[in-house]
Regions:
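ATP-dependent small-molecule kinase phosphotransfer cores
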Residues: 54-136
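Pre-Walker A adenine-sensing motif
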Residues: 3-15
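NTP-dependent small-molecule kinase module
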Residues: 168-239
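Conserved phosphate-donor/acceptor-positioning beta-strand/loop module used by diverse small-molecule
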Residues: 114-117, 149-172
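Conserved lysine of the Walker
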Residues: 32
């Protein structure tokens, strides 16, 4: 199980001078959005936009992503179960958002904070295990995208908790979740599958020389406690 740590694993420090991009990620019920909301209230932090198909500028990114995604789309649309619209949006998000965000970066010194950002999107695609994710075209795309984002992000915050805590939160929180109300064995299998995918992707990020990963156990630490530990890295620290 993860725990609060003062140090982090990885090759690069979690905050660098100049543009800084930090992603919060973790298994369902770990408290990602709660922590993101706390950090987002502070000065010097701006939450990164996610993809919304109703915005014309985002629709343009979908069109521009098609040539690069075509080999992946062929596999996703010709084999059942087929790729869903949300999965397509995740593919576009991971493919185009580095370029998209560079056009509207916050002022120097302001941290761009991702709540379920590009690394999470890659994990979700892999964890869902659709047939198109087993094809060579997806593997090549995934490796290329992960390498790009590993060089773009300056910090990763990974939240986890014991299985029983995560499962209880999924069922008790007001917002919906596809595992909510399912048998416990089904829910615990879901948690384990996603955790394995997170660990696989984070291990690859480290191998690619990506940012350090700060790990916290939200079963023993509150979001406020974690935020207090993270805030100094988002403000004044330099790599």
């Amino acid at each position: 199980m993860t725990r609060i740590v003062s140090t982090a694993v990885g090759r690069r420090p979690p905050a660098l001078s100049g543009d800084r991009k930090v992603e919060i990620l973790g298994v369902a019920g770990a408290g990602k959005s709660t922590l993101a909301a706390l950090l987002g209230r502070g000065t010097g932090v701006e939450k990164a936009a996610f993809i919304h198909a109703r915005q014309p500028s985002h629709l343009a990114q979908m069109v521009r992503s098609t040539p690069r995604l075509l080999p992946v789309l062929v596999g996703g649309l010709t084999r059942t179960p087929r790729m869903t619209w949300p999965e397509f949006k995740l593919l576009v998000y991971v493919t185009r958002w580095r370029l998209f965000l560079r056009r509207s970066m916050p002022p120097r010194g302001v941290v761009l904070l991702f709540d379920q950002g590009p690394v999470y999107a890659l994990v979700r695609l892999k964890a869902e295990g659709k047939p198109f994710t087993t094809r060579r075209a997806f593997e090549r795309w995934s490796e290329e995208m992960l390498g790009g984002w590993a060089g773009e992000l300056t910090g990763l915050i990974f939240l986890d908790a014991p299985d029983s805590v995560l499962w209880s939160r999924i069922n008790e929180r007001p917002q919906g979740h596809k595992q909510k109300g399912e048998e416990a064995t089904t829910g615990l299998d879901f948690i384990a599958r996603y955790r394995r995918s997170f660990e696989d992707v984070l291990r690859r990020v480290e191998e690619l020389g990506g940012p350090r990963v700060l790990r916290f156990d939200t079963g023993t630490a509150t979001a406020v406690q974690i935020a207090e530990k993270v805030k100094p890295l988002l403000k004044d620290r330099r790599g």
